[in-house]
Amino acid sequence: MQREPALDPQKLAAIRAPFDRLGGARIEASVLQPLSLLIDLAGESLRARLFVVQADGAEEMALRPDFTIPVVETHIASHAVSGLYRYEGAAFLLAEPGSDQPSEFLQIGAERFGVSDDPLDDDAALAALAFEAASAGGRQDLELRLGDPALFAGFVAALGVAPPTAARLVRAFRSQRALHQELTPDRQPAAASEGSDLSDILAKMSEKDAARLLGEVWRLSGVQPVGGRTAEDIIHRLALRAEAARAPNLTAGQSDLLRRFLQLSDRPGRVLDAIAGLAKEAGAELDLLLDTWAKRLAKLEARLAPQWGGVHLATAFVRPFGYYDGMVFDVESRALGPDLPVAAGGRYDALVSRLGGQPGAVGCMVRPGRAILGLRP
């Protein structure tokens, strides 16, 4: 396993300092995480890059690819309504084939939980924290890229897309290939054979009977559901997916508007203006969503005024981990390019709820090995 080179202690301390000033509890997160939980929460595409271990007769575990899920678990176990946590340690993610990137690397980060009086300010504060910490490594070419899956979901809904089709689009948003297929007006429906035999059987039953059967299958096989989901939750999700698969395709006009929406990448104010123009063209109502984003940008600009010229909003930008559902961001170096972010983060309210906690969560992390100028990333 390729590791990062040794990091300069003084520069590492400078990167750590903004997190120390933030305060909160310093925690040690579990290195091993249940593989099924990671895949369920972060997405199937992550599987090929995980380091998986398994003892005889035990469930498959994976080395943590980042800290978010283990920190969420720590917070929920504390039974606290709100919390602020800092962490520092190694994360593990197999490098892409042909890449010279390390598969073991240091992360420093923070996660904030709980219902806030001003969640927009929390978003701005964590993004500014990430930028400040990333800048402490000496790079002068950093930029901040913003995105929000909720912007896409809101635009889809405003176009009057049928709810099952809209749900299908939102799921596809994290995959360029899947989204391209969805935006094709003559898209062919998914073949029925794509599901498993069991899921096909369950889909033909009432939700109540299907949940009872699935529970019996679990009992007989000794299987434990992951992520705190009940049989009823899973059956309801299968029913929604089956409904989405049968949903009508987009019209040519809807597809064209969505393609133009996804091409937007510019200074944040210009992107919001362009979205407003598309909404007006479609006769859609997006004022509330755009007003919320305008307020978020004002708070960000107040915290990042000297760096504001390097802030961009991209409507197609999405974090690789599938649990982010609000504003997301990458701090990028022009020298390293967008595929090697120096820092990253975002809002993931629904993840905490899915694991049994109270909604409200935003966090960020920095990769010191990329932040330190002159160090091979």
For the regions a language model picked out, list residue spans one by one.
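Positively charged, Gly/Ser-enriched RNA/tRNA-binding surfaces
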Residues: E4-P34, D66-H79, G83-R139, G195-P377
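An N-terminal, globular interaction/scaffold subdomain
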Residues: L41-E60, T68-A80
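RNA-interacting cores
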Residues: S78, Y85-Y87, L142, L146-L151, ...
